[in-house]
UniProtKB/Swiss-Prot annotation:
Organism this protein belongs to: Toona sinensis
Recorded metabolic or biological pathway in which this protein acts: Secondary metabolite biosynthesis; terpenoid biosynthesis
Residue sites binding Mg(2+) 3 per the record: D492, T496, E500
Name of the protein in its database record: Sesquiterpene synthase 1
Catalytic activity reported: (2E)-geranyl diphosphate = (4R)-limonene + diphosphate
Sites where the protein binds Mg(2+) 2: D348, D352
Renumbered ranges of motif DDXXD motif: 348-352
EC number(s) given by UniProt: 4.2.3.20
Main location: mitochondrion
Transit peptide: 1-39
Family listed: Belongs to the terpene synthase family. Tpsa subfamily.
Tissue expression remark: Expressed in roots, rachis and leaflets. Accumulates particularly in glandular cells of the leaf rachises.
Annotated binding of Mg(2+) 1, by residue: D348, D352
C-alpha cells in the first residue's frame, strides 16, 4: 500500500501546484517512507508555540451535543440478560440444532429455506458448521434438479453468498426464444422477489444481466405492492425494494425480520422464541460494550465537555461497531474499533473545522514520527488528543504481542499516518480555495473517509486471523480495501455534503463531479448511486476470487459497506443523531418483548 500512497500524494501535490500556477499556494511535499510507514515532511516551517492562540479565527460546525447522555447510557439494563433466560436460550439453541440436523430428511429446497430463515433471524452464527455441511451436500446436484424460479434464485443467492461457484446462465431456462425474461414469470411474485435478491450477488462481468433482471423485477414488484395481494409477501417486497438483502446490516435485518417472521404463515414457534431471546441476549452484550466505551471516552477528557467544537458521538460509534461485527465473542474487537471511530470523528473535525494549517502540520508530523516527545510542539488542545491516540494504539499493539506474538503496531501506525497526511492535503485544498478534479479527490477521499483505518483496527483486534502474514493483506490486497472504502466514501458524501458545504468545508465528490461534468446536483447524485451499484458488483467479484481470505475479515469489510448504506440512508446518521435514533433504540436500547 505504501507505494500507492506515495504516488498519490506526489501526483496530487504536483497537479495542484500546476493548476494554481503558484508554488506558494501549496506547501512543497517531500514524502519518504521508512519501515513501511508513511513519513511525510509536509511542514516548511514548524512553529514551536505550544499554546492555543485564542485570537485565531476558528470555524465552527455548531454540532449539537449528544442526545444520549453519559448517565442515561450507564443506567441501561436489559431484563432478559442472564438468569432463567440464559437457561432457556441454551435449551432452545439445542432444539434448533436438532431441527437443523433433521433437515437431511427433507428435500434440498426446504433445507435452503431453513438456512435462509436462520440467517435472516440473526441466529445462523450458532450453526456455521452445520450450515456448511448442508450446503456442501446440496451444492453438487441442487441446480440441475430445480425447475421453479424461486428455487433456482434462492439457491443462486445462498451458494454465492457462501463462496460456491454458480454460473449466471442458470437463469437461461427462464428466457423466451428472443433471450428475454419470460413474461409468464409475472405470475410468481415469490420467485420474482427471489430473483431480485439473487441479482445483487452478480459480478461486474455480469453487469448486463444484473440491470436486465433488476429493471424487470423492480417494475413488477412495484406494481405488485400497489394491489397488496398478500400482506406478508408485500411487506417483504417493500423491504427489499428499499435496500436489497445483500446490502443490509445484519443486526437491523434480524430485528426487522423477527417481527415479520412472527406474522408469516408458517412460523415455527421454537425458532421464533429462540430468535427473540438470542437477540436480547446479544443486545445485552452490546449494552455492556456501550457502557464500557462511554466510561472510557469520558475518562479520556476528549468528550463534549472539553472538545466542544467536535462531534461527540460515542453511541453512534458503538452502533458502527456492532454493525460491522456483532457476535458476542468479538467484544474486544468492537471496543478497540470504537476507539478508532471515536478518534476518526474527533480528529476529522480538527482538520476540517477547528485547526489552523500550521497546527495541522504539527499534528501530522507528530503522528508520522510516532514519538511521545513530539507532543511538546503541539498546541494545548491537541496534546490530549495525541496522547490518547498514541497510548491507545500502543496498548492495542501490546495486547496483540502478548496474546498472539504479533506486532501489529506498524500496520496500525501506517494506517493512521496515511489518514492524517490525506486529511492535511484536504485542509490545504480548503486553505487555498482549490477545487480538485474528481479523480484527484477520489485518489485521496477513498482513504480519508476512514474506511481502511476502521478495517485495520478491527482486523488487528481479532485473535485468530491476526498473524503477520495475514496482516500483510493490507499491502497485497490494496484494491479490495479500496472498493469497500469507496462505497463508504460515496454514501458519506451523499449524506453529508450539503451540510458540510453550508459550513464551508471542502467540496465533496458530488461537487467535484458537477464542476467537472457540468451536470446538476440531482444528476451527480444519480451518478454516484450508479457507481455504488457498480462498486458492489466489483466487491462481489473480489470476494469470489479470494476464497482463501478469512471469512471473519471479509465479513468485517463488507459489513462496513453495509453500515455506510445504513448510516447515510436518510442523511448524516453519524453527525445528526436524529437520523440514527430509531436504529440506536432498536439495536442498543429496547429489547424485543418476550413472554
Amino acid at each position: 500500500m505504501a507505494s500507492h500512497v506515495l504516488a498519490s500524494l506526489r501526483s496530487a501535490s504536483a497537479r495542484i501546484s500546476t493548476r494554481l500556477q503558484s508554488r506558494s499556494c501549496i506547501l512543497a511535499t517531500a514524502t519518504s517512507f521508512s519501515n513501511g510507514f508513511v513519513s511525510a515532511s509536509l511542514v516548511q516551517s514548524m512553529s514551536t508555540t505550544t499554546q492555543c492562540d485564542e485570537s485565531v479565527a476558528r470555524r465552527s460546525a455548531n454540532y449539537e451535543p449528544p442526545i444520549w447522555t453519559y448517565d442515561y447510557v450507564q443506567s441501561l439494563r436489559n431484563p432478559y440478560a442472564g438468569g432463567s433466560y440464559a437457561k432457556r436460550i441454551e435449551k432452545l439453541k439445542g432444539d434448533v440444532r436438532v431441527m437443523l440436523q433433521k433437515l437431511v430428511d427433507l428435500d434440498p429446497l426446504h433445507q435452503l429455506e431453513f438456512i435462509d430463515t436462520l440467517q435472516r433471524l440473526g441466529v445462523s452464527y450458532h450453526y456455521q458448521e452445520g450450515i456448511k455441511g448442508i450446503l456442501d451436500t446440496v451444492y453438487n446436484n441442487y441446480m440441475q434438479k430445480q425447475e421453479s424460479l424461486y428455487a433456482v434464485a434462492l439457491g443462486f443467492r445462498l451458494f454465492r453468498q457462501h463462496g460456491y461457484h454458480i454460473p449466471a446462465d442458470i437463469f437461461s431456462s427462464f428466457r423466451d426464444d428472443k433471450g428475454n425474461l419470460k413474461s409468464c414469470l409475472g405470475d410468481d411474485c415469490r420467485g420474482i422477489l427471489a430473483l431480485y435478491e439473487a441479482a445483487h450477488l452478480l459480478v461486474e462481468e455480469e453487469r448486463d444481466i444484473f440491470y436486465e433482471i433488476v429493471n424487470f423485477t423492480t417494475a413488477y414488484l412495484k406494481e405488485y405492492v400497489k394491489h397488496d395481494n398478500d400482506e406478508y409477501l408485500s411487506a417483504l417486497v417493500n423491504h427489499s425494494l428499499e435496500i436489497p438483502l445483500h446490502w443490509r446490516v445484519l443486526r437491523l435485518e434480524a430485528r426487522w425480520f423477527i417481527g415479520a417472521y412472527e406474522r408469516a404463515p408458517n412460523t415455527h414457534p421454537i425458532l421464533l422464541e429462540f430468535a427473540k431471546l438470542d437477540f436480547n441476549d446479544v443486545q445485552a452484550t452490546h449494552q455492556e460494550d456501550l457502557k464500557f466505551m462511554s466510561r472510557w471516552w469520558k475518562n479520556t477528557g476528549l468528550d463534549r465537555e472539553k472538545m466542544n467544537f467536535a462531534r461527540d458521538r460515542i453511541v453512534q460509534n458503538v452502533l458502527w461497531s456492532l454493525g460491522i461485527i456483532f457476535e458476542p465473542q468479538f467484544a474486544y474487537c468492537r471496543r478497540m474499533s470504537v476507539k478508532a471511530y471515536a478518534f476518526i470523528t474527533l480528529i476529522d473535525d480538527v482538520y476540517d473545522v477547528y485547526g489552523t494549517l500550521d497546527e495541522l502540520e504539527l499534528f501530522t508530523d507528530a503522528v508520522d514520527r510516532w514519538d511521545a516527545t513530539a507532543i511538546e510542539k503541539l498546541p494545548d488542545y491537541m496534546k490530549p488528543i495525541f496522547r490518547t491516540l498514541y497510548t491507545s494504539i500502543n496498548d492495542m499493539a501490546l495486547d496483540a504481542r502478548k496474546d498472539r506474538g504479533v506486532d501489529t503496531r506498524p500496520f496500525l501506525h501506517k494506517a493512521w499516518s496515511t489518514l492524517f497526511n490525506y486529511y492535511l492535503m484536504e485542509a490545504k485544498w480548503f486553505s487555498n480555495g482549490y477545487m480538485p478534479t474528481y479523480k484527484e479527490y477520489m485518489d485521496i477521499a477513498w482513504f480519508s473517509v476512514g474506511g481502511p483505518v476502521m478495517i485495520v483496527h478491527s482486523y488487528c483486534a481479532i485473535a485468530n486471523p491476526a498473524t503477520k502474514e495475514n496482516m500483510e493483506f493490507f499491502q497485497e490486497y490494496y484494491d479490495i480495501i479500496r472498493l469497500w472504502s469507496t462505497i463508504l466514501r460515496f454514501k458519506d458524501d451523499m449524506g453529508t455534503s450539503s451540510d458540510e458545504l453550508k459550513r464551508g468545508d471542502n467540496p465533496k465528490s458530488i461537487q467535484c463531479y458537477m464542476h467537472e461534468s457540468g451536470v446538476s446536483e440531482k444528476e451527480a447524485r444519480q451518478h454516484l448511486g450508479n457507481l455504488i451499484t457498480e462498486t458492489w458488483m466489483k466487491v462481489n467479484k473480489n470476494r469470489a476470487e479470494n476464497p482463501h481470505l478469512s471469512d471473519v475479515y471479509m465479513g468485517i469489510a463488507i459489513n462496513m459497506a453495509r453500515m455506510a448504506l445504513c448510516m447515510y440512508q436518510f442523511g448524516d446518521g453519524h453527525a445528526v443523531e436524529a437520523h440514527s435514533k430509531d436504529r440506536v433504540l432498536s439495536l442498543l436500547i429496547n429489547p424485543i418483548p418476550c413472554p
